[in-house]
Every structure is written in structure tokens, then in C-alpha cells.
Amino acid sequence: MIEPARLTRTLNPKTLAVIGDVSRTNYRWLRCMSTFQGNIYSVQIDPKEIPGIEEMGIKNYQSLTEIPEDIDFVLVAVPRVAANAVLKDCINKGVAGAAFFTSGFAETHVQEAIDLQKEFTDIARESGIAVIGPNCMGLYNPAAGVRFGEKQAVGFEGDTTFISQSGGHAGDISAAAYANGVPVNKVVSFGNGVVLESADYLEYFGNDEQTQFIGMYIEGLHDGPRFTKILKDVAKRKPVVLWKGGMTDAGRRATASHTASLAGSDKVWDAMCKQTGALQVESVDEMIDLINALRLLPKFTGNGLGVTGGSGGQSVAMADTFARAGLRIPDLSNGSQEKLGSWFSLVGASFGNPVDMGSNREQVDVILDTLTTAENVDCLLVQVRPPQDDDEDRERMQTQIDSLKRLKSTTDKPIAVIAHSSTPAHDGSAIADLSKTLREESIPTFISYERTASVIQKVLEYNQNH
């Protein structure tokens, strides 16, 4: 059992060392850690590598024990055969924790590697050192400037922590979170998880006051009952979004060779999520969408949607998509329809629900106000078409944004935007700009009917159970 205080030092280091970085990778780990806010050291015994390290302004030592101060966190990038010796050096130095990028252990299914991992595990567990990995990317802590990718942003604090068995997914999740305005507290990539596994991180961050939302990517478990117990406890107190890899036969085979984990059946995982209150997703995009919605939307427990902004055909598509997700687009009351009808004389316009969007600010305001005040509408969804390279398009969208900002300041009902378009001219940058503008008003944006329906249904499910 790792002491929580030791794990806290590991995840929030004031000092760190990188062991084994080399010029072949252009000293990737030392470059990643160049943003670290504390003291950083290198340990490298190869004389050919030392000049390149010192040119970076980093002091190199021949041994970890030579470093003249206590070390909180170590990133280890040495060959597999040296891993156990380096682990012992970390223990002798009194290091709080270490992330082992080193791979080639039990995930290879080679007996020699399996035996080496067992020896590694026994040494670590006996000492009480907090080991992340092996076969992992380690830690991303933006506030401390600890990174495992050079493009990861730093210098901010967040309320969302991601725990990932996959290093690749950990990188993708951190990038997607930053791009979509989800403020990261920590990202931990734990790989084989021989000392600290998913349940340990979940328990720790479940008790972490800075972490209000948890996202997890898991391929398999060492102790299913313990994980389930902890998940049930944590999910009562904060949202836990779970993405399970290896849910198909092909995925289970890939899992075995990736992190040497037992994947388990999809039915077992589905049942566990329902039992514990965890929210299950199937991709990075869905995880980020859902966490953004949980962070930004006021709590609602009814499934009635007020929808506006689409054409006739789009309204039909939205109605079908939301209905399949168990959501309702209720008819508006006679009073609401009469209010809309008295304002508009547009040929071909629909004043039912979904409602066609108006063409000027006054019309847009009336439509949004009418839908928001309707008693059988619990959540408002507004389709906003990102502009093409056209002044009229930009003016139309700005009218909708201004009206949404006004509405947000006058209602407690949740509002979300669908930035849906099949037009190639509506590129990603336009949607990203729109999403950023609306996030500043606590209005989440989704880029398809399907993603919107999935997220709203899951948020509703969470709200109804908490």
C-alpha cells in the first residue's frame, strides 16, 4: 500500500530527475521537462551523451545518489535490463515516486520479461515507492510544468483528472481537453500498473479536492471487486467517465499485447457501470464532450428538449436522433405557438418544436425566450451554423451568439449548441472559435446530432441518479 502523502509528492513534485535520456531521441524527456517549475537534474553515465545534456543547461550526475537534494519524482528511460538496478537507486535515494517509460516486460508474453517484471514489482512493493508503470508515459501536471509531450500546455490549474492505461490515449486526451477548454489537473499514464493500478489512482483522485471530474481509459483490471467498490464510492461524490478498451474479441487480443491486462467481457463492464453510477463512453471525443457538458450545464432531470435552428429536414433528423436516445421533443403549448405565430409571418416557417430560427435579433430573442419558458422544456438545444467566408453569414451567427449570451444571463435552464454542418467551408477553426466563445458563457458546443444526443442522455442519467 502506497502512502497517500508519498503519492502526493510524486504527482506534485518540487524536484525531479530524468534518468537515461539520450541524443537519439533529441533528449525528449529533458525537453519535455524544460517547463518544470522546480529543480531538474539528469542522470546519465554515457560520456557521449553528457555534453548534449549540459548544453541544455541541466546538471548531469553519474548516479541518482549524487544529487545534493531530495528528489520527489523521477522519469526513467533506460533499457529493460537496467530497470531493476535503477529502481533500487531510486529507493536508496528516498525518491517519493518514479515513472518508468521502460517497456518490454510482461506485455511481451516472454517468460524472461515476465520474470523480470515480477522481480521489479516485488522490489517496488517491499520498499513502498510510488511506481507509475512500467511501459507508460507517466505524468502530466500543467501547474507544476511536468509533461510527457512537448506540445502539452502548462501554467494553469484545472478541475479534471484523466487516468489512462494507454500512453497514446493519455496524450490524445490531454490534447483534446486543452483544445476543448477542459482544464486539466493531472493526466496519469500508468501502463502495466504493477504497483499503482487504476483502482489506486481512482481512490486517490476521488479524495483529491482539486479534482472535481475524473476520466478514465482502462483496458483491464488486476482486482475487479476492489475497483468496483472504489468506483461506486467515488462516483457518488463526483462524476467518473469510463472508457473501456478491449470490448470486442479483437480489442481483447490487442489489450493482452499492449499492457498485459485481462480485458473482461463487455456485459460485465456494462453491468458494473450501471451498478456504480459511472458514465461509459467509447472514444476520446465522447469523453471530452461529456465532461464539458457535466462541467458547464446546470443540473436538469427532465428529458424534454426545446430545439431550434435547423431546416425542415434537419429538424426531422434531430427529432429521430434524440428520440432514439430516449429524449423527447415535446409539442409546444397552444400559448407558446400563438406567441411565436403572432411575431412571425414567414412563409414556410415552423412554429412547432423544433422551431425554425428567426432571421434577426428580435426574432431570435422571441424564439429562445419562448422555448426557455415553456413548462415542458427542460433543456434548450440551438443549432448554430458556423459561417462560411461571407459577411452575411458572420453577421447571422453573431446575432445568434449575442442572443444566447443574453438568454444565459436570464435563465437557469441548460443551454447547449449544435455546430452542425456538412458544408466543407465550415472548417474546424470556425467551429473551434465558436465553441470557445460559447464556453466563456458556460454553453457547451457539440458538432453532430448524434454526439449531442449521446451526451445529453448521459448527463440526464447522471443527474437523475445523483
Spans of features found by a protein language model:
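Catalytic-core regions of core metabolic enzymes
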Residues: 1-466
